[in-house]
């Protein structure tokens, strides 16, 4: 029997850990979900994701309705009130239930003396909702993004920045990758239809299927048997551009959690793949994915800047570098990114990307292919990065993706399409 915890207080604690301590929601949420009944896990997730998606608005409302912020040991109450606002604005939870459960959350976080305050603020919001929302619609907070990121997007995409922001604020579609070693995409779509679900093929990525309605993985035909994997359509572009062949030595660098490693092996089952990532904990997910799909690869922990430590003098026919980045292309999937990143991070990430590129390029055989990929939409990490690399690397040439002036292919997030993603395909002369 699961403990019956107050969902609203758990959501408030999760958001506080993300915003105040810089922890990622993917690390914070699973242990909290263990504290609630199975039937409540989806609502807990919705409250956490929703509050982080709309955090700017909820913060703005608190500042309008409270004379001073909650601080110190009372800080969790600040986020509990946000959870209350979110329910009233964006969920189908009946207002009386949202109010009662949120107020009761004060008991769970050992602040029962603040129940009256929480109740008062939420009721005041209900009374003034229309006026407040009209005022909010003209405020700087309306974009639901930190100001530094709005400025960067405006500079990079003068005519498209609002579309990018709108896409980031949407719920993401659920994309799958059909394992071509088991089924054709059309064949698996037939199995999906037999299971009472509908999916749509992607026009450019041959294994990609978008579910009409997101579903739990255990409901997908053959998921446990490795027939299908959850992976965004744009991420599937990496293996498409890499075009791995059987018998080749292939390096998948920054490989965790293993989605691209396994895609490479689906396309070229007899390739010799080395998957490397700096994060030992995340490598466990690479092993899990390989096991579920019945595949084999060499998996090593290592820093991409120092290849001698993990591959000696070995050279590769193809290298996929899915570089560490700001993840500004996947905000709709991970809304905590907006609050975990800082403006100063971008220059640091660009420097790290350049160091890894320079370190692994000598490990590519002449005539070999390196695909540089990020899930960022910022030019400093993408086109500017590749332009600078081509200028300082005489034996590197761009292939298929873009022009020397505008190197690479930049996918922007949006609608039912894939996430924001960048690829540059480079050939060693």
Swiss-Prot record:
SUPFAM superfamilies: NusB-like, S-adenosyl-L-methionine-dependent methyltransferases. One of its GO terms (biological process) is rRNA base methylation. It is found in: Cytoplasm. Coiled coil: none annotated. Residues 400-412 have a biased composition (Polar residues). Belongs to the class I-like SAM-binding methyltransferase superfamily. RsmB/NOP family. Signal peptide: none annotated. InterPro entries: MeTrfase_RsmB-F_NOP2_cat (IPR049560), MeTrfase_RsmB-F_NOP2_dom (IPR001678), NusB-like_sf (IPR035926), NusB_RsmB_TIM44 (IPR006027), RCMT (IPR023267), rRNA_ssu_MeTfrase_B (IPR004573), rRNA_ssu_MeTfrase_B_ent (IPR023541), RsmB-like_ferredoxin (IPR054728). Its EC number is 2.1.1.176. GO terms for cellular component: cytosol. GO terms for molecular function: RNA binding; rRNA (cytosine-C5-)-methyltransferase activity. NCBIfam families: PRK10901.1, PRK14902.1, rsmB. The gene is rsmB. PANTHER family: NOL1_NOP2_SUN FAMILY PROTEIN _ ANTITERMINATION NUSB DOMAIN-CONTAINING PROTEIN (PTHR22807:SF61), NOP2 YEAST -RELATED NOL1/NOP2/FMU SUN DOMAIN-CONTAINING (PTHR22807). S-adenosyl-L-methionine binds at residues 254-260, 277, 303, 322. Residues 397-419 are annotated as: Disordered. It catalyses: cytidine(967) in 16S rRNA + S-adenosyl-L-methionine = 5-methylcytidine(967) in 16S rRNA + S-adenosyl-L-homocysteine + H(+). Specifically methylates the cytosine at position 967 (m5C967) of 16S rRNA. This is Ribosomal RNA small subunit methyltransferase B. The active site is at residue 375. Keywords: Cytoplasm, Methyltransferase, RNA-binding, rRNA processing, S-adenosyl-L-methionine, Transferase.
């Amino acid at each position: 029997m699961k403990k019956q915890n107050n969902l609203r207080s758990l959501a408030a604690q999760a958001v506080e850990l993300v915003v105040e301590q810089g922890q990622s929601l993917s690390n914070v949420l699973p242990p909290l979900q263990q504290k609630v009944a199975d039937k409540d896990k989806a609502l807990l997730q919705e409250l956490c994701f929703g509050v982080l998606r709309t955090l700017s608005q909820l913060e703005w409302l608190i500042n309008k309705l409270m004379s001073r912020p909650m601080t110190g040991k009372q800080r969790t109450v600040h986020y509990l009130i946000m959870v209350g606002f979110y329910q009233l604005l964006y969920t189908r939870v009946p207002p009386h239930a949202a109010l009662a459960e949120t107020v009761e959350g004060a008991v769970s976080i050992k602040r029962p003396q603040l129940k009256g305050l929480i109740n008062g603020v939420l009721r005041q919001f209900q009374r003034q909702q229309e006026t407040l929302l009209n005022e909010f619609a003209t405020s700087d907070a309306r974009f639901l993004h930190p100001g530094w990121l709005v400025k960067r997007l405006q500079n990079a995409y003068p005519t498209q920045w609002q579309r990018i922001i709108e896409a980031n604020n949407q719920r993401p579609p659920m994309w799958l990758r059909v394992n071509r070693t088991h089924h054709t995409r059309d064949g698996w779509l037939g199995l999906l239809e037999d299971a009472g679900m509908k999916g749509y093929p992607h026009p450019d990525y041959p294994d990609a299927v978008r579910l009409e309605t997101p579903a739990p993985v255990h409901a997908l035909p053959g998921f446990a048997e490795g027939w299908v994997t959850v992976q965004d359509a744009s991420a599937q572009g990496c293996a498409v551009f890499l075009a791995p062949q059987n018998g080749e030595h292939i390096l998948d660098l920054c490989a965790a959690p293993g989605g691209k490693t396994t895609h490479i092996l689906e396309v070229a089952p007899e390739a010799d793949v080395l998957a490397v990532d700096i994060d030992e904990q995340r490598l466990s997910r690479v092993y899990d994915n390989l096991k579920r799909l019945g595949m084999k690869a060499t998996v090593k922990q290592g820093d991409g800047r120092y290849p001698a430590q993990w591959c000696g003098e070995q050279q590769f026919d193809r290298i996929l570098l899915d570089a560490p980045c700001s993840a500004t292309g996947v905000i709709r999937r991970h809304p905590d990114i907006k609050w975990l990143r800082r403006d100063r991070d971008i220059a640091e990430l660009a420097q790290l990307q350049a160091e890894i590129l320079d370190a692994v390029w000598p490990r590519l055989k002449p005539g070999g292919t390196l695909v540089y990929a990020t899930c960022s939409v910022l030019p400093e990490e993408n086109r500017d990065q590749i332009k600078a690399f081509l200028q300082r690397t005489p034996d590197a040439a761009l292939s298929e993706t873009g022009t020397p002036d505008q190197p690479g292919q930049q996918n922007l997030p949006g609608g039912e399409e894939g996430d924001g993603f960048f690829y540059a395909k480079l050939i060693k002369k």
